Structure formats: structure tokens, C-alpha cells
């Protein structure tokens, strides 16, 4: 940590973030923002998300229920908050950064079956709580973190959270008061009728937290508007928290305002003080510039996302953030027009895409809306509108090209039509013997070898890159030569897969189009505010150019 070189190693610091009153207050953004403030002070920080559900991971959950499944470099299917952490901290995390009840109990049961508990009666305390603490410490050690920020999902009072709350309570006993900090995020509703903030729910939430042995050191009050100083003093008095340790987190227009807002109030210094750290002035220049561009863009461009889960934007969270990052890079605001892919099957496409300058088809599964996505890809190809296809979006582009350019009538994916006469998209051979769904796809970072002279090579500026993946199907290698003869450009492959010379098709594009790109990977998972994804930067740049021409 910061300090003199001869001071010796300092103990690791742990910050635990809990939530009260209601769920979905934004603990993930608070965790990410605090991590960003600490990183801006020069500390090595990591963040861990605890999800109290019994699922082992988020991989098999419905997007409408849980939002996006975020994939880490090591192939873990995790909660979408892990994506927030990676973006705000500008670092790759791992499967250990997302801890679930399912993982903990599965591990403890397996240890008991192996006889590791030496005939003990296995109980929540100490065996489950010890497993939780061990996993948190393991991540901290592996990632050489000086400060570990741990978000406990759910709401204080939920029965599922109790073992985790007990585990984090024990951390103070194990590590000492100066090395642990409890931060509680809670709702302070504002009643329009009486024009007042109501603090009673927060008082009850803190009382519930105290009931499990945790006295919060810092409170962050979520509200639709800034919570005034006199209300914060009242909350401090009735919750036994220092007055200077109660902060306001009002609703803001842009997520990247949150770190700046909290720093302005002194949250970073309060955390330093509580953990016995020296005061450091953070370097927040990037965040300040990003917010300035978001609030005062030089241009605005509208992108259509033709997807399946358009009523649940969180299902495409990293995609939206990647577009935002690309907008910042291009000093532009990116507006999204949500288009239900199923509606495109019979829609007037001129009307559906009337006011957009780019069409994006995201990843997804299942047959619903597929033909609408195919029509969207055809419209983009024929009208020379910038097109970006992600994962399934690449496969859609190949299906459309095969049918309408290569003359392969009825071409399709075997995922949607097992009896198609031309299976231009087929199940990967490695997937034929796979049983079960959880964690069985081609996941995580895989290399892409990029062909020189292509659009993709111009975007990345290099011949090999790593991108995240999450798929079971691929472009059928038996059709690649024919598609290339018809004019499709295979601009990237994964080298050496299954011993084939050509490798798995990773990217396709068109020569006679200003920007038509399909990627089998999910580059949005690696896009960061400070390091935006090259395909997204190029896509937004092309959309801006199209808008100017139009």
C-alpha cells in the first residue's frame, strides 16, 4: 500500500457492503464506484459479489429474471455486477469473484463426503461460514489485493443472506477493527405529498443489521434526490454512525457520475480514515472527462438493437456500456432504439429503421425472433447501413448471406431447424457429447487470428487478440469455402481448433459495405471506459459517418 518502503507489509483491508429496505438499490454501482475511488488513489483493489441464491452460477438463469450473464476471462458465467466491477476497476476478474450459496454448500458437502471434516457434525457455523471466509481470502491472495470490497447481494433480513452476514461479522473478530469496514446502502424515500424524506425504514434496516452483530461504520442513503445535511445528521443520530460518515447517493443521469459525486462528499477519505490509511488525492481526471462528454457530446447517433429481450435492457448491459464507451471515444452520445426482433418478421423495415444510423444484432438463444433478425441483417447489407453482429448476430449474418447471396435456399442453423438442407451454422463437434447446461459452452477468453488487410485488422491494429466467448454453435466449416467464393470475407479464426487448418470462424465481413462486421465473440465483455472495444468504436464511428452522409 501507499507509505514508506521500509514500513513493512500492512494487513489487508476488507470493506463489506450490505443493502437494506429494498433490493436493486445499486449496491453493484456503489461497490464499483468505491473500488474506482480506491484505485484512483493507487491501491490494488479487487471486488467480490456474494449472491445468496442456491444456483451454482448465473449461467442457466432467465435474462428476464436476472439480466445479463457476464463471462469472465477464465470462463465463469457470473452475475452482471462482475461486469460493473471490471469496467470501473479496469481489470480482469475471475470465477472466484462471484460467490454463491450453491458454490459454498456444494463445496462443503463434497468435503464432508471425502471425509475432510473427520466425522464432525457439519453445521452452518463454523463449516459454512469458514468456507465463505476461506473463499474471500483466497481471491484476495490470488489477486494480490491490498483492499477487498465485498458486496453482499440481497437485502438485510433475507433468510438466504444470514450465513454470509455471520461470516462477514466474524471478519472483524479475525482481522481487527482497523482492517474491516461495514458500509450499508439503504433507501430514504422522498414523499412528494408531504415534501419530506422518511428515515424510519433506514433506522429499522440498521437495527436489523445490528441484530446479526454488525454495526455499520458508513451509511450511503439512496434517494431520488440529494438527501440534505440535516436529514443525514438525523440518520446518524438514530443509527449510531458518525455524522461525517453518512452520505447521499441520489439518482443520476450517468453511472460514471457516481464516483465523482461520492468523492465530492468525502466518501473516499472516510474509508481511508476508517481503515487507518493515509490521505491520498485521487486522480479522477478520466472520470471527469467522461462525464463531461456524456453530458455535453459533440454529436448524437441512434443505433437500433434488434433483440429478443428488449423489454429488459439489463439483459444487454455490457452491450449498452460498450456502446457508451465507444460514444465517449468518438465524443458522441449513443442513443439506443430497442426493436423487438419478433416484430420485424412482418414489419415495414423502412419504418422500423427509419431514424437509425446503425443496426446491432446481439447474442441470444432460441428460435423466437430469428427470422426478424435475418431480415434486419439483410436490410443493413442491402441499404449499406453499418451492421454489427455479436455471437448469434454473426450467425444471423451468415444465414442471411447464404440464403440471399450464395443461393443456398433454406440455409439455417441446426439450432433453429435441425432438418435444414444447408446447415451453415451447426453445433460444435466438442458439444455433441456434452450433458447438462451449466458451464458447458465454449466460454472465456479465446484467441482470434485476424487476417491482414481486413476491416477487423484496421480496428484492432494487430493480428491476434483475445476476446470472450459464450456459444455452442459455429459457422459450419463445410460451407466456408463456398461462402467465401460468394463474397463473404472470413476475417478472423481461432487457430488450430480440432486440428483443422482453417480454424473456427471468429469474424466475417463484407468487402463492398462501409461497415458490416460479425463476431462470434462477445467483445462487449472486455470493453472498459478507459479502453473501449475496437469493434464498437469502429461501429459507432461508421454510424456517425452514415448519419452525416444521410
Swiss-Prot record:
Residue ranges, annotated region (Amidoligase domain): 1-277
Binding site for UTP: 23, 198-203, 234
Coiled-coil spans in chain: none
Residues binding ATP: 24-29, 81
EC class of the enzyme, as a word: ligase
One BP annotation, GO: pyrimidine nucleobase biosynthetic process
Xref: InterPro entries: Class_I_gatase-like, CTP_synthase, CTP_synthase_N, GATASE, GATase1_CTP_Synthase, P-loop_NTPase
Pathway in which the depicted protein is active: Pyrimidine metabolism; CTP biosynthesis via de novo pathway; CTP from UDP: step 2/2
Single annotated GO MF: ATP binding
E.C. number(s) listed in UniProt: 6.3.4.2
Catalytic-site annotation from UniProt: 391 (nucleophile), 522, 524
Additional remarks: CTPSs have evolved a hybrid strategy for distinguishing between UTP and CTP. The overlapping regions of the product feedback inhibitory and substrate sites recognize a common feature in both compounds, the triphosphate moiety. To differentiate isosteric substrate and product pyrimidine rings, an additional pocket far from the expected kinase/ligase catalytic site, specifically recognizes the cytosine and ribose portions of the product inhibitor.
Protein name as catalogued: CTP synthase
Gene: pyrG
Amino acid at each position: 500500500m501507499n507509505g514508506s518502503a521500509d514500513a513493512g507489509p500492512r494487513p489487508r483491508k476488507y470493506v463489506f457492503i450490505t443493502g437494506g429496505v429494498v433490493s436493486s438499490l445499486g449496491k453493484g454501482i456503489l461497490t464499483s464506484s468505491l473500488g474506482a475511488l480506491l484505485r484512483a488513489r493507487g491501491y490494488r483493489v479487487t471486488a467480490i459479489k456474494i449472491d445468496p441464491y442456491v444456483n451454482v452460477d448465473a449461467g442457466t438463469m432467465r435474462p428476464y429474471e436476472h439480466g445479463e450473464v457476464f463471462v469472465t476471462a477464465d470462463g465463469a458465467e457470473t452475475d452482471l455486477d462482475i461486469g460493473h466491477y471490471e469496467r470501473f476497476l479496469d481489470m480482469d476478474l475471475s470465477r472466484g469473484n462471484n460467490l454463491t450459496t450453491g458454490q459454498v454448500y456444494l463445496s462443503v458437502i463434497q468435503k464432508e463426503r471425502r471425509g475432510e471434516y473427520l466425522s464432525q457434525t457439519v453445521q452452518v457455523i463454523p463449516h459454512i461460514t469458514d468456507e465463505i471466509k476461506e473463499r474471500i481470502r483466497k481471491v484476495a491472495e490470488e489477486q494480490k489485493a491490498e483492499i477487498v470490497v465485498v458486496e453482499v447481494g440481497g437485502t438485510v433480513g433475507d433468510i438466504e443472506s444470514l450465513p454470509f452476514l455471520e461470516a462477514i461479522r466474524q471478519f472483524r473478530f479475525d482481522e481487527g477493527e482497523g482492517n474491516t469496514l461495514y458500509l450499508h446502502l439503504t433507501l430514504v424515500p422522498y414523499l412528494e405529498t408531504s415534501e419530506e424524506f422518511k428515515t424510519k425504514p433506514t433506522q429499522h434496516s440498521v437495527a436489523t443489521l445490528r441484530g446479526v452483530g454488525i454495526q455499520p461504520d458508513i451509511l450511503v442513503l439512496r434517494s431520488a434526490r440529494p438527501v440534505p445535511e440535516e436529514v443525514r445528521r438525523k440518520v446518524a443520530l438514530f443509527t449510531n454512525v458518525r455524522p461525517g460518515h453518512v452520505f447521499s447517493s441520489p439518482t443520476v443521469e450517468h453511472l460514471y457520475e457516481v464516483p465523482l459525486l461520492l468523492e465530492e462528499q468525502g466518501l473516499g477519505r472516510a474509508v481511508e480514515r476508517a481503515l487507518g490509511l493515509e490521505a491520498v488525492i485521487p486522480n479522477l481526471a478520466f472520470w471527469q472527462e467522461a462525464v463531461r462528454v456524456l453530458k455535453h457530446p459533440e454529436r448524437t447517433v441512434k443505433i437500433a438493437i434488434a433483440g429478443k429481450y428488449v423489454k429488459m435492457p439489463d439483459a444487454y448491459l455490457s452491450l449498452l456500456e460498450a456502446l457508451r464507451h465507444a460514444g465517449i471515444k468518438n465524443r458522441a452520445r449513443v442513443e439506443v432504439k430497442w426493436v423487438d426482433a419478433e416484430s420485424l418478421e412482418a414489419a415495414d423495415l423502412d419504418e422500423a429503421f427509419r431514424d437509425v444510423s446503425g443496426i446491432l444484432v446481439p447474442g441470444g438463444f432460441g428460435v423466437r425472433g430469428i427470422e426478424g433478425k435475418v431480415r434486419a441483417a439483410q436490410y443493413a447489407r442491402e441499404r449499406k447501413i453499418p451492421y454489427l453482429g455479436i455471437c448469434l448476430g454473426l450467425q444471423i449474418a451468415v444465414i442471411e448471406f447464404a440464403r440471399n447471396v450464395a443461393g443456398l435456399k433454406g440455409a439455417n442453423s441446426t439450432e433453429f431447424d435441425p432438418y435444414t438442407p444447408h446447415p451453415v451454422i451447426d453445433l460444435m463437434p466438442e458439444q455433441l457429447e456434452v450433458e447438462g447446461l451449466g458451464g458447458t459452452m465454449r466460454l472465456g477468453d479465446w484467441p482470434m487470428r485476424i487476417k491482414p488487410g481486413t476491416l477487423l485488422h484496421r480496428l484492432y491494429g494487430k493480428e491476434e487478440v483475445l476476446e470472450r466467448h459464450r456459444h455452442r454453435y459455429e459457422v459450419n466449416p463445410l460451407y466456408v469455402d463456398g461462402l467465401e467464393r460468394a463474397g463473404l470475407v472470413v476475417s478472423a479464426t481461432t487457430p488450430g481448433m480440432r486440428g483443422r487448418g482453417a480454424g473456427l470462424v471468429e469474424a466475417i465481413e463484407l468487402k463492398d459495405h462501409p461497415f458490416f462486421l460479425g463476431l462470434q465473440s462477445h467483445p462487449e465483455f472486455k470493453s472498459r471506459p478507459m479502453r473501449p472495444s475496437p469493434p464498437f468504436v469502429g461501429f459507432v464511428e461508421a454510424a456517425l459517418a452514415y448519419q452525416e452522409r444521410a
